[in-house]
Regions:
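C-terminal motif of bacterial Sec signal peptides marking the signal peptidase cleavage site
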Residues: 24-28
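Beta-rich interaction/scaffold domains
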Residues: 49-114
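Bacterial Sec-dependent N-terminal signal peptides
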Residues: 1-16
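Intrinsically disordered, low-complexity serine/threonine-rich repeat tracts
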Residues: 34-53
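Bacterial signal peptide processing site
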Residues: 30-32
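Extended amphipathic ligand-handling, pore-lining, and cofactor/metal-binding catalytic surfaces
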Residues: 53-58, 105-347, 352-414
């Protein structure tokens, strides 16, 4: 982005003056006053042009600063006003100015990227909760279509299974909460807000159902927050994440992991147009599920999912992670594993509850470091296709969450 500094201003006005002087020399010093007027106009036009460019840059920088101010993990007393101000400033920009927005985290995509219809979602932040609440806790996503299909899909399934309970929502990522609020005007509770709402509404029995995959860092933080509110309720139960207990090493698998492995593989095979996984294998097609990865000890869950796929005889299904933790799940290692197994076609699909930023960019993006690009760049495969769909929209996965919720509800009565 070209900056119009004071030196630029001086250079331009000096150049304009020089042009005016040249014009005077060429027409003679005794030229009429119209020559002088023309020179002044040329100088003013040049100065005006720089001034306009500076104004564009200042307007774009203002929006970038406002976006960076709300791209934070902590909510404060100014957050609502900051979100509103950022959107108002963005809306006031011209299309050209919007393309100039660039900050530490800010870019034109923050407000400008179309991620679907936010009105299809339900923030589930209503009062009048009643005595019994199921609080569904998710990391969150700013991708509207995925939020409605994946997170709302899980919440709807739980609400259908428990019509006498009030299902409410909390996100743990304040950055995402702020993004959705600023761009779409949808206010989603963070954990503290959701728990305070439950207390204010006189909730007696609270069940917390995380949509997290595993007992990782996000789960631990959620537990700490819930523990700090336990004495505000008559009873509290926390349900299992999707993959259930972690286990001690990569060989440990359980009923949850088996159910997830079967559900996601069946969905991927069907979406790819095959009658069976074996038919896909005969076609030379491998399925690669890309998770997030973590440095938390729960990262062994990804290795366990690969063990589970192997135990089921799913020889053309591979597990990877964006972060490359565990090490064998790094993209380059998965590429080598698929290549060594002799498959010539690859289908990539996220091993994530939502198909958000990681699925759209890290997996299926056009950048050279996306998984799609890396598989293609290896030169080992005839085709690399992507299925951009989160786990949350899969009906069988939704029912696994319902089963975990049921176990937690039953524990309150036991």
């Amino acid at each position: 982005m070209r900056k119009a500094t004071n030196k630029n201003w001086q250079r331009v006005t000096a150049a304009a003056a020089a042009l005016a002087l040249c014009a005077g020399v060429l027409t003679g010093c005794g030229a009429s006053s119209s020559t002088a007027a023309g020179s002044t106009a040329a100088s003013s036009a040049a100065a005006s042009e720089v001034s306009s460019e500076e104004a564009d840059e200042m307007a774009a920088k203002n929006v970038a600063d406002l976006i960076d101010a709300i791209y934070v993990q902590e909510r404060n007393e100014n957050t609502d006003a900051q979100c509103e101000a950022a959107k108002a400033a963005w809306d006031a920009l011209t299309d050209a100015q919007k393309e100039m927005v660039e900050g530490e985290e800010a870019s034109p995509e923050y407000f400008g990227r179309d991620t679907g219809d936010a009105s299809k979602d339900d923030a589930r932040n209503q009062d009048n909760i009643g005595d019994n609440e199921i609080l569904v806790v998710s990391f969150g996503t700013s991708f509207n279509d995925s939020r409605a299909a994946d997170i709302k899909g899980i919440e709807d399934a739980i609400q259908a299974a428990y019509p006498d309970w009030s299902v409410r929502r909390a996100f743990t990522a304040q950055i995402i909460i702020n993004h959705v609020q600023a761009r779409d005007g949808e206010k989603i509770d963070n954990m503290e807000q959701a728990l305070e709402r439950a207390v204010a509404n006189g909730v007696k029995d609270l069940v917390v159902q995380p949509t997290h995959l595993m007992h990782g860092a996000e789960y631990d933080e959620m537990m700490e927050m819930v523990d700090s509110y336990r004495d505000q309720f008559e009873s509290v139960a926390i349900a299992e994440p999707l993959l259930g207990e972690v286990g001690s090493d990569a060989t440990v698998i359980n009923a949850d992991k088996e159910a997830v492995a079967k559900a996601i593989t069946a969905e991927a095979v069907k979406t790819a147009g095959f009658d069976s996984l074996d038919a896909a294998a005969e076609d030379g097609t491998a399925f690669v599920f890309m998770g997030h990865g973590t440095s938390h000890t729960a990262k062994v869950s990804y290795s366990q999912m690969q063990s589970q796929m192997n135990a089921l005889g799913y020889k053309n299904v591979f597990i990877g992670t964006v972060e490359g933790e565990p090490e064998e799940t790094a993209c380059e290692n998965v590429i080598e594993a698929v290549k060594a197994a002799g498959y010539t076609k690859v289908v990539l699909r996220p091993l994530m509850v939502v198909a958000g930023d990681h699925a759209n960019n890290d997996m299926a993006g056009d950048d050279e470091d996306s998984w799609k690009s890396q598989f293609e760049a290896s030169g080992e495969f005839d085709s690399v296709d992507c299925q951009i769909a989160g786990l949350g929209e899969v009906a069988d996965i939704q029912q696994l969450y319902v089963a975990h919720t049921k176990a937690a509800v039953d524990s309150l009565n036991g």
